[in-house]
Regions:
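Bacterial N-terminal signal peptides that target proteins for export
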Residues: 1-7
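A beta-rich soluble binding module of mature secreted/lumenal proteins
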Residues: 18-171
Length: 171
């Protein structure tokens, strides 16, 4: 009986760690073009999370992998250790490749949701959320974005149930 309980607990942890869903009442962008999304993005705002705690000047670089997936290189400055921290991961489409819903992993078989829910026509600004409303990033091709545009993206997030008070701004 004890072995069965441990197995069930580990299975639940595994499934919880592999959540790639989109938060309720939110849809990823359609007519998504990965080739236009590839390249460097800068984190302008985020809901803080355990894997980015204490980091600033965060950037993400996306490139194609040989297996058709996306190589993800995240980099951020730790003021505590006074050095750059880098994480390398991989991402794959959850649905069709023209929908902005991907799953991303930085650790073995564990995937999380990477859902692009707002993206400008020129692929310069992006609003990305995870599997629930505890994960949110506003990304820009440059380290800053016009304040009125940032406000538009933050209002969009707020109108979809994200707590604006939890969002850190880095510009």
């Amino acid at each position: 009986m004890r072995v069965k309980s441990i197995f069930m607990f580990l299975s639940m942890l595994l499934l919880n760690g592999c959540s790639v869903k989109v938060p309720k009442d939110i849809s990823p962008v359609e007519k998504f073009d990965l080739s236009r999304y590839l390249g460097e993005w800068h984190e302008v705002a985020r809901i803080d999370n355990r894997f980015e705690k204490g980091l600033s000047k965060v950037s993400a670089n996306y490139s194609l992998r040989d297996d058709g997936g996306v190589k993800v290189v995240n980099r951020g400055w730790s003021s505590e250790s006074k050095k750059w921290k880098e994480s390398i991961g991989k991402a794959y489409f959850v649905e069709s490749s023209d929908t902005g819903a991907l799953k991303v992993s930085f650790f073995g078989p564990f995937y999380g949701g990477y859902n692009i829910i707002k993206l400008d026509d020129n692929y310069q600004y992006s609003l990305v959320v995870g599997p629930n409303k505890d994960y949110l990033w506003v990304l820009s091709r440059t380290p800053t974005m016009p304040p009125e545009l940032l406000n538009e993206y933050l209002s969009f997030a707020s109108n979809h149930g994200f707590d604006r008070q939890r969002i850190l701004i880095f510009q």
